[in-house]
């Protein structure tokens, strides 16, 4: 922005100054073509050159003195804007008495080619009233080529800024200051020699002097200001004076051709000025040709990002006296191969050597107490790091991704190692953590951040942990895939979250008896671990702590453990034996899920919960789901509720002992337990939840205790061998499909307190199907209080022969007995007719027996009136006759199974299982081409036959395709037919 300072304003300032000095008002006059105003200097009459009514042009000579009113006055000043806009001014000779030149004095003098400011001039620029105002004294002098400064001691801002044709600058020995922005953007200056008299080179004095190649700074200069030489791209040589004490931030930033720099011993600061307290130093940032740096003896703090991205820097000499290597000091200096850190250094700052990709070794002396975050991160050539005994703190990510680091020796006093400190050091083979170390963790600024201190150190084989390391931190050794030997010393109390997760070669580990917590995922996926002994000191085993330890065969859980959290041993497929300590109270959801080799487990009396943790309130329990080798379960006395799917798909489970005290059998609790033969539910249980015994195809008998109030939907569905069910006296609700497809069930007695045979409220449009397709069911007794009945409750029970309805039953629902084609007698004891759906029955050939007093009503009311025979109960009810299908036979010939039965018109229901479809973990499996066949015969109106089991050994004789015991041409025909069928 250009500031216009008018002649009138200049006069007002001169008048104000005169008034303050108690002198007469100034008078303007003209002499020799130059305009003046009267002033007083040091008590003597003087004159100041001012702007005339016409622009000055040509060659102007300002005399030493001028005559006015008969007296002689010294010409002591050139006022502000005196020659402003004099575009045809060629030259100016300044008189010997001029001591000051005002701001914008020669602004826009486009033809002025040279200016020689004599030694008598002390001030160029602003006056005291405008100390922050840019001087711009020669701004816009676009033809100016040569400048000579004599003994200037005070200089305002931007005196020669933007004079793009200045080539030569001569600074006199009396000059003491080079002001802010003085030669900024003077793009043709090639050399600068600063004399010894100069004390200060101020902010941006030579910024963007892009042609500058050589700089010599005299021994008198004590400070170089902020960005003083920033952007001098072609500066090749810079010689700094011996008295230099301070260099401001970014002073030489972007000097891309600068090759070397020697910082004098008196230098104490490479930093920002106080106006930029949060600004990085960046003093030599981006000096991409800089190869050599020597730092002075008194430079204690090197400042932040001082040599950032000096990509050619090879040789760095840090003299003793340096105490701080600042944040990012050598960040991105990709050619530093080695550096000697003197034993005066106390702190290595954050990112001090970040990305020094040529650095091979580092020796941190004992004087250093702190290594900052990311100090050596991404030093990919670093092979060896020795950390002195004085270091107490290694910051976050200090050596992260030092991918070739093979040896790291830690000093004895290291107390804290930050998160990801050695993350990704893929060639690090061994680490010994000192006994003083207390923390492998994040700093307080990252309280939720995982430690990951040695994560992904893929070559790490051996780790020894110190005595004072109480908390090992989260994910500290995660994915150290070569780690075999771990020594945890007494003193450790917490094995952190994910600490050894993915360490696939840890085969054994001793956990000391000081450990109290094994946190979540601590040993997740340690696939070589074969046994674990958890001491009594441990109180909590976290979620997924040993999940996926696929070779773990034995686990002993100490008596101090109270909580065994979610998925703690999930997918430990070879785990055969688990001893659970006497104090365990809670086993979390899926804690032993998919432990397919687990044959036995001791569930102690203190265990109260098989459930999810509080973080997964909607998650199924599934604690022992798919433990296919588990044969027997005895529940402890304090288990009050078994959560969802606790023993689901335990296909080898044959018996379960549910103690009196358990109140809830959860959803899908025993679903898919195909070997479970019987279950007795004690009176303490009040609810059997949905699908609790769904698909227990081996169950023969179930006794439901008198305390059970609710059996939810599908609770015993597909229990295909269930022959007998005893329902407790307090039962009130049976949910939809509760006993659907229980094809072996022969009789059902609905207790008198049952009010509902129905769907739950989530399925209001769903048919009940409570006993649908119970193909062997012969007799049904409906209780006294049934008031709600959904559709199709006993549909497709095609062998149902007798229905007994007790007096008090209020309703018989839609299609209740639909498809019950073989019903012979219905004994309805209801004096008051139940509300009966029009389609409740599909077979009206059965004999209906009703109370004598209601006989007429039944005969007059549909659908009861549709029955062909309606008699009174008092007249006697005959016992139903029972016929049964003959037992089927099974033969194999011509590549086919052939079923036969003596009962005419019988159908066959069979199931064929190929025994070659196997699950296991053995290294060798014999394929025997064996098929297991189960079959029974059925026919409407009579009882199903007995079930036949048939074993077929196919092709036992090699080549005997048709199974006739002889290998001949007939076998070839059979094989061809089999192939054609397959195609």
Language-model features, listed with the residues they occupy:
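Short, compositionally stereotyped local motifs that mark structural "simplifiers"
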Residues: 876-957
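Boundary at the C-terminal end of the N-terminal hydrophobic targeting segment
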Residues: 24-28
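Structural signature of tandem-repeat unit edges
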Residues: 33, 55-77, 87-100, 110-126, ...
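Alpha-helical segments with a strong preference for the paired helices of cellulosomal dockerin domains
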Residues: 961-983
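Bacterial N-terminal signal peptides that target proteins for export
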Residues: 2-12
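Consensus positions within tandem repeat domains that build extended binding/scaffold surfaces
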Residues: 79-82, 103-107, 135-139, 156-161, ...
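Bacterial N-terminal signal peptides
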Residues: 11-20
